[in-house]
């Protein structure tokens, strides 16, 4: 299956159902009152974490998700049914962005609300008052939330294996875990992150073999920055270094890898680290390890041979101790800024010339969507709201005359005395 770890996706929750204008017209019911029911709420869209998924391919092909609309209200005060919620499975470890804001970090197998359905409109029964016992007033259902999202899969593993190509990461993964990665004697055998479960006595933890890094990876060289992001989620970095090749310099390899991690994200520098000195079965190993240890006497270094399966229990113990003592990494959700609604400034009046005026603005648009302008009572309610907001005062201030035209989205009327 193709590995897709970053996609853009449009989501639109369901629209609320419209409220109904209706009156009781039944035999033996004198002066039947309003009986229009409310519309149902639009369906929400949820993302659900799924440990069985490891790619965003299914959503990459889908491109967009549209929620279910609420049903319109009916006669006899019948409420419209709410739109059925949609639950979309995504891999655990997926971070959901709207622009630069993190709106969800999918770290558990549970639903996360992504887009909320629109509220259903009220039917005319809800507008009955002592003064107006037969209202011809209703509301449209509101649109559901619409968002353009970026989904980024950051592999959810406790330990991330990093290192140069052909350092032996895939072989190591295959001998300490249940994973069966591709193993070959050439660079970039691992093309996508490979996960494996490591058991240590009664404990277990997840390791990820990440594609080999080369100098300039943070700028996209090799398999580059695309896979560096997967290390962000790992609690512990296991830096696998080849100490068994006469032509390789473990000290230089280590410094280059650390530098790439530092240049990509300074926080990676602060992660707990275990240096895995691989290929201890080779003749040059001890000499290279001694030289390396002189430069880094305080580093946690575990000497192993993945090929000969030597010293693996000691490595498992070191990794487990690091995992156990490190907190889970969760991406903080962006806090919504507090919004203060100022009705006086929430519209704009534009004089187009030749007796034509345009009124627009977010709050104007909200009420325009909410109130169906199909009855006298609804029109009166809409006009009263505009008057209270100060729209009429602004039109008069700009010099509107009787007979001039006022356009509010698709609604147009002629200015009169009232």
UniProtKB/Swiss-Prot annotation:
Its EC number is 3.6.5.-. Residues 339-417 form the OCT domain. GO terms for molecular function: GTP binding; GTPase activity; magnesium ion binding. SUPFAM superfamilies: Obg GTP-binding protein C-terminal domain (SSF102741), Obg GTP-binding protein N-terminal domain (SSF82051), P-loop containing nucleoside triphosphate hydrolases (SSF52540). This is GTPase Obg. GTP binds at residues 163-170, 188-192, 209-212, 278-281, 305-307. It comes from Mycoplasmopsis pulmonis (strain UAB CTIP). One of its GO terms (biological process) is ribosome biogenesis. PANTHER family: DEVELOPMENTALLY REGULATED GTP-BINDING PROTEIN-RELATED (PTHR11702), MITOCHONDRIAL RIBOSOME-ASSOCIATED GTPASE 2 (PTHR11702:SF31).
């Amino acid at each position: 299956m193709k590995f897709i770890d970053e996609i853009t996706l449009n989501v639109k929750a369901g629209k609320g159902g419209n409220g109904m204008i209706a009156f009781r017209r039944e035999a033996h019911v004198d002066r039947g009152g309003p009986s229009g029911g409310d519309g149902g709420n639009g369906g929400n869209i949820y993302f659900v974490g799924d440990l069985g998924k490891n790619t965003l391919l299914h959503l990459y092909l889908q491109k967009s998700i549209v929620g279910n609309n609420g049903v319109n209200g009916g006669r006899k005060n019948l409420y419209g049914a709410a739109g059925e919620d949609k639950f979309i499975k995504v891999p655990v470890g997926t971070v959901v962005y709207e622009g630069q804001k993190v709106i969800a970090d999918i770290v558990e197998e549970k639903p996360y609300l992504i887009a909320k359905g629109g509220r259903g409109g009220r039917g005319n029964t809800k507008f009955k008052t002592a003064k107006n016992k037969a209202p011809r007033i209703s509301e449209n259902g509101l649109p559901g939330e619409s968002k353009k999202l970026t989904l980024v899969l950051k592999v959810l593993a406790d330990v991330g294996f990093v290192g140069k190509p052909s350092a032996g990461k895939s072989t190591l993964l295959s001998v300490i875990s249940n994973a069966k990665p591709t193993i070959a004697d050439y660079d970039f055998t691992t093309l996508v992150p490979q996960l494996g479960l490591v058991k240590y006595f009664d404990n277990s933890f997840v390791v990820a073999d990440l594609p080999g890094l080369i100098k300039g990876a943070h700028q996209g060289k090799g398999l580059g920055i695309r896979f560096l992001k997967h290390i962000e989620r790992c609690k512990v970095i296991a830096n696998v270094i080849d100490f068994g090749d006469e032509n390789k310099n473990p000290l230089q390899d280590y410094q280059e890898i650390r530098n790439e991690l530092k240049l990509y994200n300074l926080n990676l520098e602060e992660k707990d680290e275990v240096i895995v000195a691989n290929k201890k079965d080779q003749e040059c190993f001890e000499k290279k390890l001694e030289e390396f240890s002189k430069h880094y006497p305080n580093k946690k270094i575990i000497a192993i041979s993945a090929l000969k399966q030597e010293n693996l229990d000691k490595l498992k113990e070191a990794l487990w101790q690091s995992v156990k003592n490190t907190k889970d990494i969760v991406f903080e959700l962006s806090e919504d800024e507090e919004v203060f609604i100022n009705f006086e400034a929430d519209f704009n009046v534009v004089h187009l010339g030749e007796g034509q005026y345009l009124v627009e603005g977010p709050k104007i648009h909200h009420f325009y969507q909410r109130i169906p302008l199909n009855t006298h009572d609804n029109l009166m309610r809409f006009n009263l709201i505009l008057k209270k907001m100060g729209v009429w005062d602004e039109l008069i201030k700009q010099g509107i005359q009787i007979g001039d035209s006022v356009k509010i989205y698709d609604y147009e009327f002629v200015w009169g005395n009232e």
